[in-house]
Amino acid sequence: KKYQVIPEDNMAPVKSKLDFVNALEEFLDIWKQHTLILDTIKDSELGILLSEANMKETRDRNPQLSLLQLEKLLNTRIASRIKFLCTEKEENEKKRKLQEYRNYFHSAKNKWTEPQIYREFLLWLMKNNRLNNNDWEETLCHVKKGRFDLYDTAALCLIWKRILKKKDADEFSQIIIDEAQDFGVMIYYVMKQVLDTCYFTIMGDVSQNIRYETGMNDWEDLKKVLFQKE
C-alpha cells in the first residue's frame, strides 16, 4: 500500500510536543500489557516451563525490545526449557512438545500495522479526553486515507519500535542536524528511541524558529530528551 506525506495538519502544534509522545508511550505500554500475558506456563507432563516471575524479569531486563522481539525471546526460552526437560525422552516426544509450544507467544498472527495502531491511539485520546483536546477528527480522517504529516510519521516510527520491530537492522553511527529549532521536540524524542545507539549533533538557533507553534522556542525539552537518565 502506498502512503502520502502531507503538510502539517491543525493538530500539529499538539503532536509536536512531548505530552503527545508521552501519551503514545503510555498507550503502547498498555497495548503490550494487554497482549503479553505472562502467567506461569505449566505443562501437564513436563511441569513448569517458565514462571511468571521469570518471564517478567526477562521483560524488565530487555526494555529495548519490541513486543514481537520479546515474544521471540520468550519462545526461544520455552524451547530451550523443553529440550532440557526432554533430555532423557524419545526424540519424537521432544519434537511433539516443541511443536505444541511453537509460537506460544504469537501476536504477529494479528497482522497489526503501524497505521492501525496509530488510529487506535487517536481514538483512545478522544475517548479519554487526553491532552485537553478532543479534536482529532481531521487527523483520523487523513490517517485512514494513508496520508500522514511529519508528526504522524514520527508516531508510526515509535509504534514500529515498541510493537512491530522484528529484528535489529544496521543503524547510522552519527546524525548531524542543522536548523533543529524548526521541528517539534517529539521528533528528536522518537529519533533517540529508534536510533538508540546513534550519536547526534544538533545545531540551531531558537530565535530563528520559523514554525512558532510546532518548532522549538527554547532547548529545555530537547535537553530532557537527549540527556535523559537510562
Where are the regions a protein language model picked out?
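P-loop NTPase motor core
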Residues: 2-40
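Generic hydrophobic, helix-prone segments enriched in Leu/Val/Ile
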Residues: 24-28, 157, 179, 198
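Conserved helicase motor core of SF1/SF2 NTP-dependent helicases
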Residues: 2, 130-145, 160-174, 181-230
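Conserved helicase NTPase catalytic core signature
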Residues: 31, 35-174, 184-188
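Alpha-helix initiation and N-capping motif
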Residues: 21, 153-156, 219
